[in-house]
Structure formats: structure tokens, C-alpha cells
Amino acid sequence: KIYKRCELAAAMKRYGLDNYRGYSLGNWVCAARYESNYNTQATNRNSNGSTDYGILQINSRWWCNDGRTPGTKNLCHISCSALMGADIAPSVRCAKRIVSDGDGMNAWVAWRKHCKGTDVSTWIKDCKL
């Protein structure tokens, strides 16, 4: 599923991401835009053989199991394919685990590059939340 910006913001809010660990909703919407272009089915292969999955591009080396990444830790206890459904709840649950891990949203390269230190409130502007 490809979400519209405000539709995604509403879903993320419903699942408790607004101000989760101090990160406002705009941070999450911005991250999703630059990680996956709001596409739940996005996948990207990394040079180390791992793959990133779903709307927040969650990595198979650490967080999910795709059955082909050697030495996966699967810290979210989830199959990577479950991160690619139209319902973003599994991705949100795992993202909460990731962002609680000590490095916050710095775990997402696209967030560091495009969202960190910017006015992320623009990402939820005009959304009826």
C-alpha cells in the first residue's frame, strides 16, 4: 500500500508514535517519506547482504527475519514480510523497539540526512489529526 501523507500521519498517531520517546509525529512521517516514499512494500538490499523492509525500512540484520540474512538477531521477533502489509501496526511496534534502543531516530539514515534538525511540523501541516 502506498499511503498518502496525512493518511499515514493519522495511522502513526493512532498507533502511538506522536511524541514516542520525544519524537513528534512529523519526524516519523518525514522518515517514512525518505525511507520508502510511503510505500509499505518497499525493499532495499544493503551491501552487507541484509535487506530493509517496509514503510520505515526496517533491517533484517537486526530487527526482523527474512530467512536469508546470515546471523540475524530478529530483535523485533517478527518476519520481515509482516513489515510490508497495508497495516503499519507491525512496523510501528518494531520502530518503537528500535527507537528505544539508545540511538533514537539516528538509527534511520534518511531521518539523519533529511529530517533531523529541520522543521518537521511541515510534514503534518493541513492534516486533520
From Swiss-Prot:
<feature type="disulfide bond">
    <location>
        <begin position="64"/>
        <end position="80"/>
    </location>
</feature>
<feature type="disulfide bond">
    <location>
        <begin position="30"/>
        <end position="115"/>
    </location>
</feature>
<dbReference type="GO" id="GO:0031640">
    <property type="term" value="P:killing of cells of another organism"/>
</dbReference>
<feature type="disulfide bond">
    <location>
        <begin position="76"/>
        <end position="94"/>
    </location>
</feature>
<feature type="disulfide bond">
    <location>
        <begin position="6"/>
        <end position="127"/>
    </location>
</feature>
<comment type="similarity">
    <text>Belongs to the glycosyl hydrolase 22 family.</text>
</comment>
<dbReference type="GO" id="GO:0005576">
    <property type="term" value="C:extracellular region"/>
</dbReference>
<keyword id="KW-1015">Disulfide bond</keyword>
<keyword id="KW-0378">Hydrolase</keyword>
<dbReference type="InterPro" id="IPR000974">
    <property type="entry name" value="Glyco_hydro_22_lys"/>
</dbReference>
<dbReference type="GO" id="GO:0050830">
    <property type="term" value="P:defense response to Gram-positive bacterium"/>
</dbReference>
<feature type="active site">
    <location>
        <position position="35"/>
    </location>
</feature>
<comment type="subunit">
    <text>Monomer.</text>
</comment>
<feature type="domain" description="C-type lysozyme">
    <location>
        <begin position="1"/>
        <end position="129"/>
    </location>
</feature>
<dbReference type="InterPro" id="IPR023346">
    <property type="entry name" value="Lysozyme-like_dom_sf"/>
</dbReference>
<comment type="function">
    <text>Lysozymes have primarily a bacteriolytic function; those in tissues and body fluids are associated with the monocyte-macrophage system and enhance the activity of immunoagents.</text>
</comment>
<keyword id="KW-0081">Bacteriolytic enzyme</keyword>
<keyword id="KW-0326">Glycosidase</keyword>
<keyword id="KW-0929">Antimicrobial</keyword>
<feature type="active site">
    <location>
        <position position="52"/>
    </location>
</feature>
<dbReference type="GO" id="GO:0050829">
    <property type="term" value="P:defense response to Gram-negative bacterium"/>
</dbReference>
<keyword id="KW-0964">Secreted</keyword>
<protein>
    <recommendedName>
        <fullName>Lysozyme C</fullName>
        <ecNumber>3.2.1.17</ecNumber>
    </recommendedName>
</protein>
<dbReference type="GO" id="GO:0003796">
    <property type="term" value="F:lysozyme activity"/>
</dbReference>
<dbReference type="Pfam" id="PF00062">
    <property type="entry name" value="Lys"/>
</dbReference>
<dbReference type="InterPro" id="IPR001916">
    <property type="entry name" value="Glyco_hydro_22"/>
</dbReference>
<dbReference type="InterPro" id="IPR019799">
    <property type="entry name" value="Glyco_hydro_22_CS"/>
</dbReference>
